[in-house]
Amino acid sequence: MSTEHKQSLSAVTLAAIGVVYGDIGTSPLYTLRECFSGHYGFDVRPDVVFGFLSLIFWMLILVVSVKYLTYVMRADNAGEGGILTLMSLAGRNTSSRATSILVVLGLIGGSFFYGEVVITPAISVMSAIEGLEIAAPALDPYIVPCSIAVLTLLFVIQKHGTGSVGKLFAPVMLVWFLTLALLGLRSIIANPEVLAALNPKWAISFFVEYKSVSFFALGAVVLAITGVEALYADMGHFGKFPIRLAWFTVVLPSLVLNYFGQGALLLKNPEAIKNPFFLLAPDWALIPLLILATLATVIASQAVISGVFSLTRQAVRLGYLPPMRIIHTSEMESGQIYIPVINWTLYLAVVLVIIGFERSSNLAAAYGIAVTGTMVITSILFCTVAWKNWHWNRFLVAFLLMVLLIIDIPMFSANVLKLFSGGWLPLSLGLVMFIIMTTWKSERFSLLRRMHEHSNSLEAMIASLEKSPPVRVPGTAVYMSRAMNVIPFALLHNLKHNKVLHERVVLLTMRTDDVPYVHNVERVTIEQLSPTFWRVVARYGWRETPNVAEIFHRCGLEGLSCQMMETSFFMSHESLILTKRPWHLFLRGKLFIALSRNALRAPDQFEIPPNRVIELGTQVEI
C-alpha cells in the first residue's frame, strides 16, 4: 500500500469518525442511566448491571457489527446507501404490487427518520448540559435555556455551511472517543470483574430472571444503538471500508470500555446512577468533560441535520416531496447543502420538544421507536434485495430474515409499549411526513395523468405545424415538458392565444435517474424531430441539482447552440380546482393544493433568469 493511499485512508477514516458516529457515539451520556430509571423498577444490583452491560455489548455486536456493517452495507446504489436507496433497489425486480408495498415500507422508514431527527439534537445536547448538575447543582434551572441557546446557534449557522468548522469535527470526535475509552478503562481497572458481562450468559440470565420486565427494559437498551442508520446512509460520502475500519478500531472499543466503566462504577457506588457518565470523571475534569460532551453532541446534531437535508433532497428529486429551495453551501463539496424550510421547521420542533420534555430522561422514552421501526423495515428491504437482485437462495434469505427479525421485532415491540410516555412524538411526526410524501406523489401522478389524458400525438402536431406553419418569430423557444411524447400545455396555450411560434422550438424534459450521479457524457440527449423542432432530454441523479445553463452548455457541445439571454422559456402554471370527493380524499386534495402553492417554481428550480420566462396559466380539476 502506497504512503499516499495510507494517508488518504487515514483521512477518510478520521472524517467518518467525525460525521458517521456522532449519534451512536454520544449514547453513553444517557443509555445506562435510563436502563435503571424508575420506569422499569430495577435496583442497581450486580446481576442487573451485568445483564444490561451484556445486552448492550451484544447489541453493538449483532446489530451494528453484523447486521449493518457486514450485511446491509452490501446493498448500495453506485456506492450510495440510505433507506430510500434500499427501497429503490428492492423494487427493481419485483411485481408491481410487491413494489408498491416496498415503496410504502421505504416511505415509512424515511418518515421515521424525520421523527427521529427532531429528538436527536434535543436529547443529545440536553444530556450533555445536564452535566451542570454534577459540576454546579445551582445551575440546574439553566439547563433548558442553555440547551436552546446552543441549538439556536447551530441552526443559525447552517445557512453559512459547515465547511470551515467541519474540519474540526473529526479531531473533536476522535478526542471524544479517546476520552470515553480512558474514562471507562480507569474505572474497569479499579473493578475488573465487570468484564464478566462480556459473556452472553448474563444477558440470557437477565431475561430468565426478570422475564416480562426485562422485555420492557429493551426499550432502554436500544438507546445504545440509536444512530446506527447513519452508517448506511453516509456510505456514499466515505465508503464502506473507512466506515468499517473506524468502527472496529476506534468507535466500538471506546463505547464498550465506557459502558463497562460505567458498570464498574455502579458496582462500586450504586448512588452514581444519577449520572454515571459524568461521575466517571475526577472532579477536576468535570468542566472540561462538560465542554467536550457539549461539542460532541453539537457535532452529532449537525450530522443528523445534514442527513435530513440529504434525505429531503433525495425525496424531492424522486418526486416524493414538492420542490423547495436548496442552497449549496460549498463550491467544492456537492453534498453540503442547506434547505431553509427544513432547517427552521426542524429548529422550531426541537425547541418545542426541549421546552415540553424539560429533561433528557423524559425524552428518552420517545427515543427508540423510530430507530427500531426503521431497523425492521431495513431488514425486510435488505432481504428482498438479496433474494430478487442478488439471487441468494430463498431458504437462506428466509433464515436470515428470521434471524434479523428475532432481534429487531422484540426491540420495536418494547419501544411501542412506550407509546403514551413519549413514543407518540416520533410516530406523530413520522405520520405527518408519510401523509405529505404519499399525498404529493399520488396526487401529482393523478394530476399529470389528467392533464395528458386528452393530449394529441406530439409527432402528429409537429407534422401539422410544419405543413401549415403559424406566424414564425425570430429566436428560440424552450418548452418544459414533463413527459417526452406529450405536447406541453404551454405550447398548446401559446398557439391558442398568441397564434405564433418561434423559428426554433426546443422541448426540454428533465429526468431523474435512479442513481446518485449521471456522468456528464450522458447528461444530454438531443433528437431533431423536424426542421424546427428539437427534443432535449436532460438526465440527473438524485444527488444532483438540474441547471439549465449546464444543459445549454452540453447542447452546444452536441451541436445545438442556445444562448440563455436570447431564449424564451415557456412554462405552464396550473391553477388547481378541487372536484367533489369523499371527505378523506377531499382533505388530501386540500393538502396537495397547499403544497403546490408553496412549492418552488420551475424557473427557480432550474436557475432560469426571471426575465426570460413566460408562464401561461391553465385550470385543472383534480
Curated annotation (Swiss-Prot):
NCBIfam families: kup, PRK10745.1. The gene is kup. It is a multi-pass membrane protein. This is Low affinity potassium transport system protein Kup. Responsible for the low-affinity transport of potassium into the cell. Likely operates as a K(+):H(+) symporter. One of its GO terms (cellular component) is plasma membrane. It catalyses: K(+)(in) + H(+)(in) = K(+)(out) + H(+)(out). It comes from the Bacteria. It is found in: Cell inner membrane. It comes from Yersinia pseudotuberculosis serotype O:1b (strain IP 31758). Belongs to the HAK/KUP transporter (TC 2.A.72) family. The chain crosses the membrane at residues 9-29, 46-66, 101-121, 137-157, 165-185, 213-233, 247-267, 276-296, 337-357, 363-383, 395-415, 416-436.
